[in-house]
Amino acid sequence: GWIIVAGSGSTMFVRNAAATLTIAVFVYPMSEDLGWSRTLIVGASSLAGLLSVFISPLSGYLIQKYGSKKTLFFSVLLLGLSSLLISRTFNPITFYILFGIGRIIFSSPVQIGAATIVAKWFINSRGKATGILGLSHSIGMGLFPLFAQLVIDLDGGNPDSWRMSWVFIGVTVWLISLPLVFFTMVDDPNEIKPKRNN
């Protein structure tokens, strides 16, 4: 059962690709390179955060219909893809759509899907398992902005160094989480053994 926590925790970790702290790293370099106002860039996070409120019921429906594994896999796939495509954006509308996708995934399907599958697998140790999910998120919240800034600084002489940083984020999301979700996660513990973990 703890391997399920590892898979779920990986999604909680990588969802920080679309965290507010992560986009904050990009505000200055993107505004300087693209000529956009900082308010415009930050606004993408705020707008998507509002939209995610209405997406949550849909996320719950998808998880109930298709299971947490499929929902989490495609959420991580989209999160990585949207990050990669942001690296190629020159248009505010395109940026809003792409970052909005990532932000909605951050706020809704990953959080709900990870909590749902852990609840199915654990009874007595559910609190500990859920706590590990929270820890995974907290670690990602600290590391993603740090790594994003490091990549920008490594190519600091280039005005569009932020683009390479988004590529790094997208690839990192895929490499860390997709294999774990695909190969280790099982929605129903009864598919493997008759009793859930304690």
Can you say where each PLM-predicted feature lies in the sequence?
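Helix-to-loop junctions at the C-terminal end of transmembrane segments
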Residues: I55-G67
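Intracellular juxtamembrane helix-capping segments at the cytosolic ends
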Residues: M30, S108-F122
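Symmetry-related core transmembrane helices of the 12-TM Major Facilitator Superfamily/SLC fold
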Residues: M164-F183
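Pair of pore-lining "gating" transmembrane helices in MFS-fold secondary transporters
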Residues: G1-T22
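Glycine-rich segments within core transmembrane alpha-helices of 12-TM secondary carriers
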Residues: I123-L146
